[in-house]
């Protein structure tokens, strides 16, 4: 079965100081009760905006679809642009900044495991 999504800011919800459209997990049916192994969301950050600081026990990839920005990750900073793929290791605080005054920053985040594993 093919499952198709469309990235659409109009259905995004406010989370983490930006607009997020949850893509995965999707509603499961009776034939597929298991959670997928990862989560995904499209993120939209307004011009000049910054996300709230976030830290979670999940690894994350950010694929930049449009715009430019800066990622602050556990005391380190790097700039990025459309087409870049950023790797965020688990348990490291991060903040995303939109470097444009007139263009939304848009990316897709993939994170795993789907549910955070409790720290021992």
Q: Locations of the language-model features?
A:
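Glycine- and acidic-residue-biased ligand/ion/polar-headgroup-sensing regions
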Residues: 59, 64-69
């Amino acid at each position: 079965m093919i499952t198709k999504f469309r990235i659409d800011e109009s259905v995004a919800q406010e989370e983490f100081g930006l607009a997020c459209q949850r893509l995965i997990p999707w509603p499961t049916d009776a034939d597929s009760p298991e959670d997928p192994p990862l989560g995904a969301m499209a993120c939209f950050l307004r011009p000049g905006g910054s996300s709230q600081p976030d830290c979670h026990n999940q690894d994350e990839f950010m694929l930049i679809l449009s715009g430019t920005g800066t990622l602050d990750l556990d005391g380190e900073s790097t700039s990025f642009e459309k087409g870049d793929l950023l790797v965020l290791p688990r348990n490291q605080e991060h903040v995303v900044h939109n470097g444009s005054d007139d263009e939304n920053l848009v990316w897709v985040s993939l994170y795993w495991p789907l549910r955070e594993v409790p720290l021992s």
